Amino acid sequence: MAALCLTVNAGNPPLEALLAVEHVKGDVSISVEEGKENLLRVSETVAFTDVNSILRYLARIATTSGLYGTNLMEHTEIDHWLEFSATKLSSCDRLTSAINELNHCLSLRTYLVGNSLTLADLCVWATLKGSAAWQEHLKQNKTLVHVKRWFGFLEAQQAFRSVGTKWDVSGNRATVAPDKKQDVGKFVELPGAEMGKVTVRFPPEASGYLHIGHAKAALLNQHYQVNFKGKLIMRFDDTNPEKEKEDFEKVILEDVAMLHIKPDQFTYTSDHFETIMKYAEKLIQEGKAYVDDTPAEQMKAEREQRTESKHRKNSVEKNLQMWEEMKKGSQFGQSCCLRAKIDMSSNNGCMRDPTLYRCKIQPHPRTGNKYNVYPTYDFACPIVDSIEGVTHALRTTEYHDRDEQFYWIIEALGIRKPYIWEYSRLNLNNTVLSKRKLTWFVNEGLVDGWDDPRFPTVRGVLRRGMTVEGLKQFIAAQGSSRSVVNMEWDKIWAFNKKVIDPVAPRYVALLKKEVVPVNVLDAQEEMKEVARHPKNPDVGLKPVWYSPKVFIEGADAETFSEGEMVTFINWGNINITKIHKNADGKITSLDAKLNLENKDYKKTTKITWLAESTHALSIPAVCVTYEHLITKPVLGKDEDFKQYINKDSKHEELMLGDPCLKDLKKGDIIQLQRRGFFICDQPYEPVSPYSCREAPCILIYIPDGHTKEMPTSGSKEKTKVEISKKETSSAPKERPAPAVSSTCATAEDSSVLYSRVAVQGDVVRELKAKKAPKEDIDAAVKQLLTLKAEYKEKTGQEYKPGNPSAAAVQTVSTKSSSNTVESTSLYNKVAAQGEVVRKLKAEKAPKAKVTEAVECLLSLKAEYKEKTGKDYVPGQPPASQNSHSNPVSNAQPAGAEKPEAKVLFDRVACQGEVVRKLKAEKASKDQVDSAVQELLQLKAQYKSLTGIEYKPVSATGAEDKDKKKKEKENKSEKQNKPQKQNDGQGKDSSKSQGSGLSSGGAGEGQGPKKQTRLGLEAKKEENLAEWYSQVITKSEMIEYYDVSGCYILRPWSYSIWESIKDFFDAEIKKLGVENCYFPIFVSQAALEKEKNHIEDFAPEVAWVTRSGKTELAEPIAIRPTSETVMYPAYAKWVQSHRDLPVRLNQWCNVVRWEFKHPQPFLRTREFLWQEGHSAFATFEEAADEVLQILELYARVYEELLAIPVVRGRKTEKEKFAGGDYTTTIEAFISASGRAIQGATSHHLGQNFSKMCEIVFEDPKTPGEKQFAYQCSWGLTTRTIGVMVMVHGDNMGLVLPPRVASVQVVVIPCGITNALSEEDREALMAKCNEYRRRLLGANIRVRVDLRDNYSPGWKFNHWELKGVPVRLEVGPRDMKSCQFVAVRRDTGEKLTIAEKEAEAKLEKVLEDIQLNLFTRASEDLKTHMVVSNTLEDFQKVLDAGKVAQIPFCGEIDCEDWIKKMTARDQDVEPGAPSMGAKSLCIPFNPLCELQPGAMCVCGKNPAKFYTLFGRSY
């Protein structure tokens, strides 16, 4: 008998039939799938739609189930109960009497009919399960005792529990509650869609196999077909006889069937050729189309140049004459095409007189030689969509430009207009979807065929183990989003894993060439049955054989040690007693002893194994693993895919398989334990009488979305221990210094290697600065790490920038004098090229010229580095030949010529390295102290032996004599440097940071001091994204976290949030608002209740689905906002007008799992905010609060953060979906030319109070209920990001004093060796005195007394952190009773008398606050203008500004503005490409709207000036 298929309408599932399926599936092959209606298909011609008919049919064909009773009397009784459940029990009026009758019948029975379960029980139970009244009785414990007992007895059984959970219709037959929250994206509600009236279509071209991109289109259309109970048309687009092949039609139909898609109608575009031709002739007669014989290339050029064709003004008669030639297929006709007469000057290329018909004389697969002219797809599609009744045409965004053409054709012909909805095309990394390119692979024999598992075809991915359900879930998760992204295949396979993991049986296979026998001396040969799946008993049992000899993986055996206890999966603990090895040290066998009584499996190694048994022979199997066919993740538009072919993409391994593998059938999916999931591609065949050989079971590996390799041996615990041991063993111990007497050849190699590492480091930095693709950066980093490892192996020490090994230095120092001359010449070239680059940047030269100059500079630097062995440093030309003494000889002081002294010298240097490494790795204090003690002892030994102190050698071989001098000069150099604002300041700072960081010499015995990258390496005006990332990390505001989109707010940034919180909290309390806290978790029911409100958040809601390893009965959401949590409580608390107003606020965190690229502060998945929610008796009270709160938000920005904002109201399109209107404050970031929403305050009207029933008795009309008026308002940590973007410069943060946690930093200067201890202590005391005095004046102050950093380093550090004022004090200042204050905002230095410290600094801080606000206000003023036309507005946008434009307020118009202002793809790289959106309708516009003014769209009168711009 053929397999049956039960189709279930998820909105109204037939529980009776589903229960019957559960009880007969052991006897009958039947599948269940979702569809539009409840239907059991028996064959192509026979199907049942009546539920009772389905039940009877299933019970009769599964005779052993006994569901239809055992005799005629029971048949009759069962029929009675089927009718009873469909009539009496389903009627609300008769429910009580029906339940009484049922209770009476069950008083002495376990089942309704006979002594076993029958259809009667299934049907009645299902009806009660779906009855809201019955469910209410159950909750209130009002049910009759016998019915309740019977209902509970059945509900506890596995089949009822399974169906009842998966298809939960409790009280509502139209609700589906899956086991857990489905991972689905947001599906747009189709405009104008009505239940039962939606018609969609899937129109593939029969020119190839369907691939996964087509599958997305088909499944999306099916989604709307099913959800709207509509109609799906499968239409073959056969408008091109050259490409159309009948063979492919059959293939596509098979592919569609594989996807379980059932179209309601099959059609061909060719069915309508006559009609389409008539429409074409109508356009010719109306002068809306013309025939053109311009050659194709010339036509293309004319369209690009917007030049009209010479035939465009032909008469209708001339056009008809040429059209007839086309229809005949004459020589002249073949050179012609029919073109629409639209607009050759249009900005949209698709509107420049597109081709409607072309002449092709090839025979058509369906119409033969009947026609010689064929319509283009773009002309035929809108006509056929209209004729066939398509209501909604779903198309990928690549057709976006053609939408205007689609609608023009509809309007020109006067036919019915379908609605077009766009969704994103599926772009997959390492994949080509072009039919032409896929055909090339097949023709070249690089793949096995169109169903090759490496292919993205439907057949290919299904053969590789993709399930239709997994594919559906993946498509559902994408939703109908328009965001075009390149996706990794891992995402698809991860969805697939969710489908196969719960049901795939577990088996074992071992790598045949590496198996090791284990002799378990006390084991007996026997067989036991164990679960095929450890967590799903429904998968069944499998036989497992045990014997005295078993086989394990060689990789596992290598991890064992004698005496170790190992867990053999499905057996128990076994002790390894002996390990036998051959002469090569390879393990040949193991001896073991059972220890099954020991049940402690927590820290043992878990391994798989197979027994040697004559009763169950191991099955030969071949595991096939496939890799991507294309090695490059994303191919450029003009790149040749053939250059990136992976010639080694298929790997096979011969395995020793589980005996159970002999029963696998083609297409069965299993999991090989500790190897992954596999699909059976070819079942095992026993020895053939023809070939005398057995055919192995071919298994194809199914990717599961993980990015790390599967563990192949040992356990996690053991692996951790092994790694720990390795790290311990590799920790620095006392070791001899690397030999100094290297050969010349070795020194030469290390020098070249050092240069190669340095050059590769520059390459990596350049790629990161350019925001190159991740794969390019990863490849460069990998090469860098390889070079570093090679360098370490060659020299015996780590690579350090600016510190080449002794061997490398030796090479440099022994170069000939001619090399020195070359080095000097190269040095001068680098310096000259640097000047060229700086000049080009200063002149704002084109990016291409700057890039070319920079590349030339990098090339010269690399050449200089290779020649000299060190980095190019401005102001440090290469030393002459005679100045480079040999560092090896220099390393030995004059009195240290003895060999033992040389060895001891090297040991001291080596131990110094150990100390530095331990400190860098933040090792424990004990370890560092121990290493330091050893270093001191070695130094003492050296002094005792040689009579002189040990002195380290610098990287160049000369002692660092000038280090103290440099440190002393650092302050004066910094002070004398002219400081400018903005660019100048940034450039100076970056230079000073670069040179100042290494100014402090090395400590004794520690060699040269390591350079640290303290300053910013990106400029705000050149690379805003990289600059922003560096500012927030280097200023210690943010620490990145291992969960994407979540960040650690360090004290430096959290203190800003505290300042905002303190101010705002105090102000709202003055208004009568109280603080509270509501739970972070939201029930699914609460969220669903307000699904319209949370629609925008739906794809971003994060769900908790498990407690430990236990699935929750119902998933729980983490709040994206708190309306759904708070308002039900409001409804309880508000009973009378006296209970109003309710004004609550909470400071909390929320989670919105955005799929967009996260940015700290600006767009994060978890963020801190305050959310206020109020309820009032009148509209006016709520409206007053909306504006009061908005003004407080404006004060936060303007008074605390020194950022000017524009106050206004959101447009209808941009307002909060659940509110009446939304007010907002908008800030502007000139560095990006974009605005950013600062905070919003919403008037919710009565929308939520109606939803949550927040009602009170009207005091004016007793007995009449009124709904409360509500408002909500929120401010987030985004404020901090805005502050960074607005005020930050190329030196780092600039903090407004009112939110700075440190307003003044005190830094002691002038501490030198010449300074006496008394003076040093006096200076420190003076610094602390300033601290006490300023704290007394309520100035937040910190003193930096760290003695391991120079003053110059500290200056840079605190400038980077944005501290408003730096207070410098030195010995001379103390004598003069004064100090120097340096402003962060301007760099201005002020000399202030000590006695005026408090008053003057308070004044300086206020001046800084005012200056920052004034500067930002001027910035906003110059970047916000009025534009009255779209053309002017576009220019304003391109200049990086925002504009107030006359606007009608219509949503369609706003969409049009956004579309028209979006940049094309060919603009300069890095420019913002998104269209402009409305920011707000300003309360105080820049100018008044003139009477009669029109909206920029030119269609409607303008209602108000509205601020538009590109936005974050």
From Swiss-Prot:
Q: What Gene3D superfamilies has UniProt attached to this entry?
A: 1.20.1050.130, Anticodon-binding domain, Bira Bifunctional Protein, Domain 2, C-terminal domain of ProRS, HUPs, Ribosomal Protein L25, Chain P, S15/NS1, RNA-binding
Summarize the protein's role: Multifunctional protein which primarily functions within the aminoacyl-tRNA synthetase multienzyme complex, also known as multisynthetase complex. Within the complex it catalyzes the attachment of both L-glutamate and L-proline to their cognate tRNAs in a two-step reaction where the amino acid is first activated by ATP to form a covalent intermediate with AMP. Subsequently, the activated amino acid is transferred to the acceptor end of the cognate tRNA to form L-glutamyl-tRNA(Glu) and L-prolyl-tRNA(Pro).
Q: Where is the composition biased (Polar residues)?
A: 808-819, 878-892
Instruction: Cite the residue spans of the region called Glutamate--tRNA ligase.
Output: 164-759
Q: What is its main location?
A: cytoplasm
What gene is this protein translated from? Eprs1
- Species classification: Eukaryota, Metazoa, Chordata, Craniata, Vertebrata
**Which family does the UniProt entry place this protein in?**
In the N-terminal section; belongs to the class-I aminoacyl-tRNA synthetase family. Glutamate--tRNA ligase type 2 subfamily. In the C-terminal section; belongs to the class-II aminoacyl-tRNA synthetase family.
Residues with Phosphothreonine modification? T355
Q: How does it assemble?
A: Homodimer. Part of the aminoacyl-tRNA synthetase multienzyme complex, also know as multisynthetase complex, that is composed of the tRNA ligases for Arg (RARS1), Asp (DARS1), Gln (QARS1), Ile (IARS1), Leu (LARS1), Lys (KARS1), Met (MARS1) the bifunctional ligase for Glu and Pro (EPRS1) and the auxiliary subunits AIMP1/p43, AIMP2/p38 and EEF1E1/p18. Forms a linear complex that contains MARS1, EEF1E1, EPRS1 and AIMP2 that is at the core of the multisubunit complex. Interacts with TARS3. Interacts with DUS2L. Component of the GAIT complex which is composed of EPRS1, RPL13A and GAPDH.
Modification N6-acetyllysine, positions: K300, K417, K498, K535, K542, K637, K788, K861, K1503
Natural source organism:
Mus musculus (Mouse)
The protein depicted here goes by the name Bifunctional glutamate/proline--tRNA ligase
Residue numbers of motif 'KMSKS' region?
432-436
